[in-house]
Amino acid sequence: MPSPTPRFKIPESVLVVIHTPALEVLLIRRADPGEHWQSVTGSKDAPDEPLAQTAAREVLEETGVDCGVGSALAGALRPWGLINVYDIYPAWAHRYAPGVTRNTEHLFSLCVPAQVPVRLNPREHTAHRWLPHHAAADTCFSPSNAEAILLLPQFVP
């Protein structure tokens, strides 16, 4: 029996800045060693997966917050029409096919009620906190995540 073909991550992903109407931003700490605080991120599961579906799936998987079709928060997920293209961190390069060095990230935001319950997947994240958006931007390890958080006021109705 042949060995299964390794499944590599698709180098197209979403970044979802989850926030309250008062611009308190949810950050989650990665389970990797170090203090890697971030917003929700994740890659497409299939090349043809719609980006909004990727965003809703990742929000649910990483925080337990349901913003998928038919949920109470479905209309609160907003695509920004902005992308970041960045070099994949060397520590995570093995997750991608050989020769893949850059990722395209699509930005979204999700406005949630204050104190919405958060349920982390402990294999991926170990803690969460809500911070004012400037403090959240200062806390992120990723420059593109910090920049997105600073842009948040421009995308809040």
How would you label these PLM feature ranges?
Residues 105-149:
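NUDIX/MutT-family hydrolases
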Residues 6-8, 17, 98-100, 119-121:
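Short secondary-structure boundary/capping segments
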Residues 11, 39, 101-105:
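Short connector loops at helix/strand junctions that flank enzyme active sites
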Residues 17, 25-28, 106-110:
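Short, hydrophobic/aromatic-rich beta-strand segments within well-structured domains
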Residues 78-117:
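Active-site-adjacent beta-strand/loop module that shapes the phosphate/pyrophosphate-binding cleft
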Residues 151-155:
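C-terminal alpha-helix
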Residues 20-68, 73-74:
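Conserved Nudix-box catalytic region and its N-terminal flanking loop in Nudix hydrolases
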Residues 2-25, 47:
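Conserved N-terminal beta-strand and adjoining loop/helix that marks the start
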